């Protein structure tokens, strides 16, 4: 006698990495703004000696980045909408450009005191496999690691995503991530940003009303 059954996997407690991809026209507009904003950093003789340069963290307030700032805000809004979060009153708390050069890598880190973080890629080198690595936040998943026949979202303990020009990734600010060694002779240019709710007092209200319980 054979035993017959049906099965299905249910994905719960997900860690959402939200991808936003610009069309070619929008990508050129935004990338031109970013390159104009950071040209002094690119042309600075001192900065050229370094493997990594970052700008001030208030680029979202720059008049030169009007379209880029609007894009970042819209991407954040779409991310919150996708998650069905009702609180859409937020503001960008920090925004800065990163200029990464050959042999630079960024350590494993998170972005504290924010709800959502993002990174937008302005310039990358496809031939050198530019990537960003997100780490599984579940420490228990690193204790026993069987070898899978094929890696997928159900058995992985990390996500290695392509850093592609015109693409932004948005993710929970608590999610730890890192950047592998940059192997290209060309600069990799990205813009990172964080956002936080402005109506925290409404978020912290108790989620129940008056009741009498037996």
Q: Which sequence ranges carry the predicted segments?
A:
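Non-heme Fe(II)/2-oxoglutarate
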Residues: 2-87, 105, 131, 207-214
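A short coil-to-beta-strand element that immediately follows conserved catalytic motifs
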Residues: 85-95
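Residue-level detector of short, conserved catalytic/binding motifs and their immediate flanks
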Residues: 95, 116, 189
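Catalytic core of non-heme Fe(II) oxygenases with the double-stranded beta-helix
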Residues: 98-170, 180, 197, 201-209
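Glycine-rich nucleotide phosphate-binding loop and flanking beta-alpha elements
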Residues: 177
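Ligand-binding loop in jelly-roll beta-barrel domains
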Residues: 180-190
